[in-house]
């Protein structure tokens, strides 16, 4: 089930996952998590470092890639 809110976040997270880009995820309480995005769905992101953590999206404030990422939301939505 896709909605307008996911037309941007899904292609972005998918590009980070496919390209194995290390990310820093900041939670709303200020905690910083680091690792690679293993998978994601409508509600959670699986973040892999030494262990795999399930992080609920409602707890995420910011996702910061370690390097620039090229992603095209329009191309992903069309496929």
Swiss-Prot record:
InterPro entries reported in the protein's UniProt record: Hfq, LSM_dom_sf, Sm
Keyword Chloroplast: no
Domain of life: Bacteria
Residues annotated as domain Sm: 10-69
Any one GO biological process: regulation of RNA stability
Assembly description: Homohexamer.
Its job: RNA chaperone that binds small regulatory RNA (sRNAs) and mRNAs to facilitate mRNA translational regulation in response to envelope stress, environmental stress and changes in metabolite concentrations. Also binds with high specificity to tRNAs.
Protein name per its UniProtKB record: RNA-binding protein Hfq
Gene behind this protein: hfq
């Amino acid at each position: 089930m896709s909605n307008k809110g996911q037309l941007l976040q899904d292609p972005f997270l998918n590009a980070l996952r496919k390209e194995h880009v290390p990310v820093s995820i900041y939670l709303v309480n200020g905690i910083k998590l680091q690792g690679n995005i293993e998978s994601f769905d409508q509600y959670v992101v699986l973040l892999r470092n030494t262990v795999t953590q399930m992080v609920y999206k409602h707890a995420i404030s910011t996702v910061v890639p370690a390097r620039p990422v090229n992603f095209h939301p329009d191309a992903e939505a069309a496929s």
